Amino acid sequence: MLTLAHYLVLGAILFAISIVGIFLNRRNVIIILMAIELMLLAVNTNFVAFSHYLGDVHGQIFVFFVLTVAAAEAAIGLAILVTLFRSLDTINVEDLDQLKG
């Protein structure tokens, strides 16, 4: 049977993979956004695990709010990336430091 520790270890592994993904790939914005989404998934896993094992529904409800914010963040981030790609023909992070406003 799976215990709370199994889910917490899974969440920690997912969180660590996302941190490694951010630090190893600092050039591609899409991979950075995917790593941030994986980080939010790890947090959601911990919320659901604590909610289930403590018998409280608040953690599961909070997951829906986090998923909503993550979806909005992904949509806005991808819209910004499309705009940057159309104007600069690249999504390389090193080339995005010359923004004009």
From Swiss-Prot:
One family name in Pfam for this protein: Oxidored_q2
Gene3D superfamilies listed in its UniProt record: 1.10.287.3510
Top-level enzyme category: translocase
Function noted in UniProt: NDH-1 shuttles electrons from NADH, via FMN and iron-sulfur (Fe-S) centers, to quinones in the respiratory chain. The immediate electron acceptor for the enzyme in this species is believed to be ubiquinone. Couples the redox reaction to proton translocation (for every two electrons transferred, four hydrogen ions are translocated across the cytoplasmic membrane), and thus conserves the redox energy in a proton gradient.
Protein name: NADH-quinone oxidoreductase subunit K
Subcellular compartments: Cell inner membrane
One Gene Ontology molecular-function label: NADH:ubiquinone reductase (non-electrogenic) activity
EC number, UniProt record: 7.1.1.-
Catalytic activity: a quinone + NADH + 5 H(+)(in) = a quinol + NAD(+) + 4 H(+)(out)
Keywords for this protein: Cell inner membrane, Cell membrane, Membrane, NAD, Quinone, Translocase, Transmembrane, Transmembrane helix, Transport, Ubiquinone
Record has Translocase as a keyword: yes
Residue ranges crossing the lipid bilayer per the database entry: 4-24, 30-50, 61-81
Topology within the bilayer: Multi-pass membrane protein
Subunit (UniProt): NDH-1 is composed of 14 different subunits. Subunits NuoA, H, J, K, L, M, N constitute the membrane sector of the complex.
Natural source organism: Paraburkholderia xenovorans (strain LB400)
PANTHER family from the UniProt entry: NADH DEHYDROGENASE SUBUNIT 4L-RELATED, NADH-UBIQUINONE OXIDOREDUCTASE SUBUNIT ND4L
Family the UniProt entry places it in: Belongs to the complex I subunit 4L family.
Main localisation: membrane
Record's GO cellular component terms: NADH dehydrogenase complex; plasma membrane
GO process annotations (BP): ATP synthesis coupled electron transport
